UniProtKB/Swiss-Prot annotation:
<keyword id="KW-0547">Nucleotide-binding</keyword>
<dbReference type="GO" id="GO:0005975">
    <property type="term" value="P:carbohydrate metabolic process"/>
</dbReference>
<dbReference type="InterPro" id="IPR011330">
    <property type="entry name" value="Glyco_hydro/deAcase_b/a-brl"/>
</dbReference>
<comment type="similarity">
    <text>Belongs to the LamB/PxpA family.</text>
</comment>
<dbReference type="InterPro" id="IPR005501">
    <property type="entry name" value="LamB/YcsF/PxpA-like"/>
</dbReference>
<dbReference type="GO" id="GO:0017168">
    <property type="term" value="F:5-oxoprolinase (ATP-hydrolyzing) activity"/>
</dbReference>
<keyword id="KW-0067">ATP-binding</keyword>
<comment type="function">
    <text>Catalyzes the cleavage of 5-oxoproline to form L-glutamate coupled to the hydrolysis of ATP to ADP and inorganic phosphate.</text>
</comment>
<protein>
    <recommendedName>
        <fullName>5-oxoprolinase subunit A 1</fullName>
        <ecNumber>3.5.2.9</ecNumber>
    </recommendedName>
</protein>
<comment type="subunit">
    <text>Forms a complex composed of PxpA, PxpB and PxpC.</text>
</comment>
<dbReference type="GO" id="GO:0005524">
    <property type="term" value="F:ATP binding"/>
</dbReference>
<dbReference type="Pfam" id="PF03746">
    <property type="entry name" value="LamB_YcsF"/>
</dbReference>
<keyword id="KW-0378">Hydrolase</keyword>
Length: 252
């Protein structure tokens, strides 16, 4: 691998509240793609505008990061709802961010569902299909960030939606290739995370929670900005990759 996307979730505060270490401004110049919170799990109109402006300043590609309607739970609680309701909620959020992007003369590069909604679409064939079918009608060239092997990935391939496969630097994997979902993420060692990412890029392997090596293929590395010590994780990972001759570059 000679180049890889490095993405992070941005703008995940709300009004006067900040999620994580409040280091968006320091992380933004280090990443190539930003997933911007669109108001349902986090974010508000003012934070969306500020985050788009910050991404534009640093030449970072932007994407919508729609979540469940769950500000209290930060979008990490599953909400049982019909597929059409979930897709309508995602379209609403996508449209909101698109206008702030247009204000800066930008287009959205991608969409990446957040948290529990991301995992719901990864498992629910009906919701994933309706979402991808809707994207095909609305914006068939919009990149869809997803987990390899998920329902989103399978249906996206089937219908021809362009996909970006993700590798999670700050999450554990199990032997099935799924990320181990958690509501509380512990602090991680930046050098260990950088080593994990470099090995995945060079060898296409990651160590699972069962202690086994798992083959992994991906186009983008995700480090969540709300993970404790996120700035150090992003900085160490970028430095390690660039030191190994791997360029950090957005998919488009």
């Amino acid at each position: 691998m000679t180049e890889v996307d490095l993405n992070s979730d941005m703008g995940e505060g709300f009004g006067p509240w900040t999620i994580g270490d409040g280091v968006d401004a320091a992380i933004m110049p280090l990443i190539s793609s930003a997933n911007i919170a669109t108001g349902f799990h986090a974010g508000d109109p003012s934070s969306m505008r500020r985050t788009v402006e910050m991404a534009a300043e640093h030449g970072v590609a932007i994407g919508a990061h729609p979540g469940f309607r769950d500000l209290v739970g930060f979008g990490r609680r599953h909400i049982a709802a019909p597929a059409i309701e979930l897709v309508n909620d995602m379209l609403y959020q996508l449209g909101a961010l698109r206008e702030f992007a247009r204000l800066q003369g930008l287009s959205l590069q991608h969409v990446k569902p957040h948290g529990a909604l991301y995992m719901h679409l990864a498992r629910d064939e009906v919701a994933a299909r309706l979402f991808v079918e809707t994207l095909q009608r609305l914006e068939p060239e919009l990149l869809l960030y997803c987990m390899p092997g998920s329902a989103t990935w399978r249906i996206g391939r089937e219908l021809g939606q362009p996909l970006v496969r993700e590798f999670y630097a700050d999450r554990d994997y199990d032997r099935s290739g799924s990320i181990v979902f958690t509501r509380r993420v512990a602090a991680l060692d930046p050098q260990q995370v950088a080593d994990k990412v470099l090995r995945a890029c060079r060898e296409g392997k990651v160590r699972t929670v069962e202690g086994e090596d798992l083959d992994i293929a991906f186009d983008s590395v995700c480090i969540h900005s709300d993970t404790p010590g996120a700035l150090e994780l992003v900085a160490s990972t970028r430095a390690r990759l660039e030191g190994a001759g791997i360029r950090i570059k957005a998919p488009r």
